Regions:
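Short catalytic micro-motifs in class I SAM-dependent methyltransferases
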Residues: 133-137
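A conserved beta-strand element that flanks and buttresses the S-adenosyl-L-methionine
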Residues: 130
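Class I (Rossmann-like) S-adenosyl-L-methionine-dependent methyltransferase catalytic domain
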Residues: 1-67, 71-122, 138-219
Length: 219
């Protein structure tokens, strides 16, 4: 079972201060120092991404990909290995520094950036955008804005793969990570994307977590 205690403590602390994203840098710093666990830093590509790709490989030749909140870089490295010209960003300077240190010869362009204030040149600039576990780490009140920002990275004809924890609307939100409802996921459609496939399943975590894995396209 993954230890999320410190992540939850920091998230609560920063939410009380009105800073819903400041805790990520603190957690990565503590993780680098061996003082805390970064729950999502598996040091391997996302298994749900790999499973999707094995079943639904996407064209990569001459295509540009973007990884949202890339952390230590494993998913970005995987997309680059599949052939994408890959950009990856995180709000945590420590995470990006660690990614560059782990992959010093990487072709991935790693950047420190804020999802809510991204570089203007990224708007509608990518053929494939990968989002996993970011929105579920944000409070409900800013999720709509986060989803709109993520959708805006997808160029016409491009695709977005989103993998999140899922729940029914009448189920409690619970603790971080906070699962999303189908209604919340539909915000990607309201942001201009078209839902291509929707998968619901339980993953291999202990205990298993309910997941939504959704592929969107900008027509």
């Amino acid at each position: 079972m993954v230890d999320r205690k410190r992540a939850r403590e920091l998230a609560s602390e920063f939410l009380r201060k009105g800073d819903p994203t400041g805790w990520f840098e603190v957690l990565y710093k503590e993780g680098e120092a061996g003082k805390s666990v970064v729950p999502w830093a598996d040091r391997g590509a996302n298994s749900d991404l790999l499973e999707f790709w094995n079943a639904h490989p996407q064209p990569t030749d001459g295509k540009k990909a973007l990884v949202i909140a890339c952390g230590l870089g494993d998913d970005a490295q995987q997309l680059a290995a599949w052939g994408f010209e890959t950009t990856a960003f995180d709000i945590s300077e420590t995470a990006i520094r660690m990614a560059n240190k782990r992959f010093p010869k990487s072709a991935v362009k790693y950047s420190v950036a804020d999802l809510f204030q991204p570089p203007a040149e990224w708007e509608r600039a990518f053929d494939f955008v990968f989002e996993a576990n970011t929105v579920q780490a944000l409070p409900v009140k800013i999720r709509e804005q986060a989803i709109q920002k993520i959708a805006a990275f997808v160029r016409p004809g491009g695709k977005l793969l989103a993998i999140v924890r899922g729940r029914e609307a009448d189920e409690p939100l619970g603790e971080l990570p906070w699962p999303l409802t189908r209604t919340e996921m539909n915000e990607f459609v309201r942001a201009g994307l078209t839902e291509g496939s929707f998968e619901e399943y339980f993953d291999n975590e202990d205990p298993p977590a309910r997941r939504f894995r959704v592929l969107y396209t900008r027509l």
